[in-house]
């Protein structure tokens, strides 16, 4: 809800690309125009989307789906996402990016260097939906699918893509296929309600985590029910202040280094639109431990935290820098909430457990007992 109004859902660029590809494949194999197309998203919600700007020929069809972001602020709102599908002599479905879809130029991202920046889930959606159409028409030949975004190169300048090493356009993204509107106050209010419920039920200690990565780690590496944790999204600072106001005795934060490293720089809202200081902070910690010259410059240019950690291992500074980072996060959390116990545990998808602040293990034991 926002100002008493129920917020409207949207759909991702990945859903648009998959729907456009499905519609183009249907028209190519049927020889008829299709004005709308149904798409089942990974979230389980079915969409019926209008098909726009149809160009139909015997061996190739091009069409578009217009991006609807719902009530979420999004630079791709109303952008046309195109798919062109053509028959090929080779068996199988090949997916590529065309105009306005970025190309990966640095390692460490969802797709390999040289590939179109169409992430894994959208690729699977495109593949599955085109295969569905092929099965419907009994087609066993090959298809070449090209996703394009005519405005993509211009839009990409407003994103972090150029810095991440994605050049020439936007990324085709989405894990659920659905865009859920982000009303900041609504999210903070939800966090407050959940924390108040925990406190009123008698909990003195609480576990926080930013989101799905943290929940997966809590379950897989620690054997704790993820429902034990309160999800903070990017609002870590707000969540800590709410914990203090409600009278919790202690708070443990478990999260991916890509989020929690920002706390060392005093960034309490970790959304990328407020800035991206991950490599700056890691490089500063590394410099304090002796990293200098070309290696420091290389770290500043790393795309992901795992890339930076790999460099630290090569330089023999891995443990020292993580220890310093944990100390810095400990200082900042204590400054934020000096009257309650605070702790943090950091992990990465590639390296698993990384480091923890002083007292984090004790807090974890108390949360398990609470």
Provide a role label for each language-model segment.
Residues 1-158, 162-164:
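Generic N-terminal targeting/processing segments that precede catalytic cores or assembly contacts
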Residues 1-13, 27, 31-34, 135-136, ...:
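N-terminal charge/polar-biased segments
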Residues 8, 164-170, 175-194, 198-324, ...:
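A structural signal for small-residue-enriched, beta-sheet-centric alpha/beta enzyme cores
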Residues 154, 215, 353:
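Flexible, glycine-rich phosphate/dinucleotide-binding loops
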């Amino acid at each position: 809800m926002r100002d008493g109004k129920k917020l409207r859902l949207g759909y991702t660029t990945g859903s648009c690309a998959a729907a456009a590809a499905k519609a183009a494949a249907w028209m190519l194999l049927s020889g008829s125009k299709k004005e709308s197309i149904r798409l089942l998203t990974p979230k389980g919600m079915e969409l019926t989307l209008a098909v726009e700007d149809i160009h139909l020929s015997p061996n190739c069809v091009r069409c578009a789906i217009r991006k609807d972001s719902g009530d979420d602020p999004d630079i791709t709102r109303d952008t046309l996402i195109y798919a062109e599908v053509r028959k090929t002599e080779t068996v199988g479905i090949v997916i590529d990016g065309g105009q306005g879809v970025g190309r990966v130029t640095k390692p460490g991202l969802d797709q390999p260097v040289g590939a179109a920046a169409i992430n894994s889930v959208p690729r699977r959606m495109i593949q599955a939906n085109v295969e569905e159409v092929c099965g419907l028409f009994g087609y066993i030949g090959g298809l070449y699918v090209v996703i394009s975004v005519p405005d993509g190169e211009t839009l990409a300048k407003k994103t972090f893509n150029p810095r991440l090493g994605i050049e020439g356009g936007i990324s085709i993204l989405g894990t659920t296929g659905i865009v859920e509107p982000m009303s900041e106050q609504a999210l903070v209010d939800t966090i407050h309600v959940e924390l108040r419920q925990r406190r009123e039920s008698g909990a003195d200690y609480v576990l926080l985590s930013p989101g799905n990565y943290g929940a997966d780690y809590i379950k897989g590496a620690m054997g704790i029910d993820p429902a034990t944790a309160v999800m903070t999204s990017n609002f870590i600072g707000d969540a800590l202040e709410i914990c203090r106001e409600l009278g919790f005795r202690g708070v443990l934060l478990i999260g991916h280094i890509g989020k929690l490293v920002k706390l060392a720089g005093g960034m309490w809202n970790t959304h990328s639109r407020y800035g991206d200081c991950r490599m700056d902070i890691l490089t500063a910690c590394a410099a304090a431990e002796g990293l200098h010259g070309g290696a420091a410059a290389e770290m500043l240019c790393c795309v992901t935290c795992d890339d930076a950690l790999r460099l630290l291992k090569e330089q023999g500074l891995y443990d020292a820098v993580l220890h310093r980072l944990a100390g810095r996060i400990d200082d900042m959390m204590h400054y934020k909430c000096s009257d309650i116990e605070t702790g943090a545990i950091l992990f990465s998808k590639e390296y698993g457990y990384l480091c923890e602040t002083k007292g984090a293990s004790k807090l974890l034991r108390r949360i398990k007992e609470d």
